[in-house]
């Protein structure tokens, strides 16, 4: 059974006679963003799961509260392994509307992956009690290149918090350069009221875990949310 949420109500429903998607299902990838389900093994990295001929055209991949972007040095971000039967947005760099790429997930031998240590534990994003937010069906991610805090050095216990007009819309533990911060958007539900909408520019603050300080992040290079 699954459920849907309308306002503060929950409606339960069941899907009968569903046909499982075969592991070798072939997807058609069009320009820009495509929402597809992952059919492989839990914990397989992006590079191991995507065929080379598709990966070279990928810009970024977004899951529920996690994201990765491809750089010259490989993939960076909080999404480093896929989770079976979860949906992912694959955004590509195809510019020709008539170009279609076809692919199937690479599903290697599971025992071989374990023996080679290539399967990663799928990590759910941590949350911070005083800065909780709701997962939205609309989300964007901001990647931090570097932060200058004079004499303060960030640790892996510190957090970056995203706000929209003083409403917390995302948070992520500091993970060094290219830490990605989710910024949730308003998707019509009460739980996301006040969240980002097209054109909004979120604010960011740093939460120092050791002292409880909340420091403003000043940047002139924050793209509008969309």
Predicted feature residues:
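N-terminal exported-region signature
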Residues: 1-226
């Amino acid at each position: 059974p699954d459920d849907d949420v309308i306002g503060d109500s929950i409606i339960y429903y069941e899907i009968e006679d569903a046909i499982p998607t075969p592991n070798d299902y072939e997807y058609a990838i069009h320009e820009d963003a495509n929402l597809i389900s992952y059919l492989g093994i839990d914990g397989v990295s992006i590079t191991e799961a995507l065929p080379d001929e598709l990966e070279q055209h990928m810009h970024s991949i977004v899951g529920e509260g996690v994201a990765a972007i491809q750089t010259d040095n490989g993939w960076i971000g909080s999404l480093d392994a896929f989770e079976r039967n979860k949906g992912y947005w694959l955004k590509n760099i195809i510019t020709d509307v008539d170009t279609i790429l076809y692919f199937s997930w690479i599903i290697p031998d599971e025992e071989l992956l374990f023996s080679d240590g290539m399967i990663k534990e799928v990590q759910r994003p941590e949350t911070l009690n005083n800065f909780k937010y709701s997962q939205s069906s609309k989300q964007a991610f901001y990647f931090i290149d570097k932060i200058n805090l004079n004499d303060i050095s960030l640790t892996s216990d510190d957090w970056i918090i995203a706000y929209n007009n003083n409403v917390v819309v995302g948070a992520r533990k500091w993970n060094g350069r290219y830490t990605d911060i989710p910024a949730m958007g308003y998707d019509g539900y009460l739980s996301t009221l006040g969240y980002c909408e097209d054109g909004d520019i979120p604010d960011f603050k740093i939460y120092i875990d050791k002292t409880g300080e909340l420091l403003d992040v000043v940047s002139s290079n924050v793209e509008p949310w969309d």
